[in-house]
Amino acid sequence: MVPPPPPPSRLLLVALVGLLSLHEVVAEPAEEAGTRCPEGLWPLPPQVLPRVTYTQVRQGQAEGITFFYHPCAHLWLKLQLAVLAHLCVAKPTLIPDFSLPWDRPLVLTAWGTALEMAWIEPAWAAQWLKRQWRRRRRKQRKSVWFLSDNLFGPTPMMPAPRRGKLCGRRCVQAPTLAFALRSWRPPGVEVTSRGPRRSSLSVVKKRGLRAALGLQSTPSGLRVSLASSQSLKAQQRTLGNSSVAPVSLMTGVTEGNGRFRTEAQMPSGQGNPGGCACPGQVSPAPRAAVPPRVARGPTPRTEEAAWAAMALTFLLVLLTLATLCTRLHRNFRRSESIYWGPTSDSQDTVAAILKRRLPLPSRRIKRSRRRPLLPPTPDSGPDSESSD
């Protein structure tokens, strides 16, 4: 009898294991080989949200990105952690740690902070790694100002590249890894629904992630007060107008392995696979809300344009009224009056009316300039001239 074909999730898992060659990922296989779990491997823990804690760099541990896991953790969890480490870090370092609890057997540390996970959350891990890497770069840039310009090469404030460098030639987008890890569930394990928040999980998880990753405790383990005005303003700017519940902080608890933890409880829900651990690539990770632009006042050109528009409108209205008045005046017919005499066709012109109404001036007799002033004498006639 032919056995049934394996499910697609198992085929995808085998393909990824062969592609990544995970037998080269584990840094200390000899230490894990000598350990034995008396009760066997642990069952899968309940799926809870990751937790950001403060940790100290141990002796012999390279400063950078390190992946810790409990040797008795479930095989699926260890395999997912190895795949995540190989995809997000160029040369990952995986170290077994017996001090990890059962509910969160996977820990990701980077430059003094740790991300404790019960299940692998690629979006959380990628966004958290990128955030820590940016903080590290900002600190290094600030420290450069205090160094001398004559120093060359790596300095204590700017360590040289080593194992644990973020990203590499096999860096993969976090959504791709999240899609693969969602199908990596042991047989019989199903992801339970989270209730009515299922529809808005992506927005809630993204903004809750940014609010949680910014919470780091101090070595004293003091309680962070939610009544402080600065923290409230920062959370309001980060969360925006969403329906995310406020982050509840708990007091820091000092553990035996030297970590001071601060729990950040956020809204439950499955993470939306967004963000990438690569700093040089464009990431669809959640971003801070863009502040509204300040309204600018009117400029001289806008005022001139407004005045020109008003003047054109006034001229147009004036021209329209003049045209209407002219049409009405032409079509208007005057009735008979006592002042204006009746005419045959009632079409008298102004000149005709003036000629008829104005009195004619009296004519004066003009004297000719050729007439003599003295009357003629009888001797000065033409007969006397002819007799001479």
From Swiss-Prot:
GO terms for cellular component: cytoplasm; plasma membrane. It is found in: Cell membrane; Cytoplasm. Residues 326-388 are cytoplasmic. The keyword Signal applies. PANTHER family: TUMOR PROTEIN P53-INDUCIBLE PROTEIN 13 (PTHR34179:SF1). It is a single-pass type I membrane protein. Residues 361-372 have a biased composition (Basic residues). This is Tumor protein p53-inducible protein 13. It comes from Rattus norvegicus (Rat).
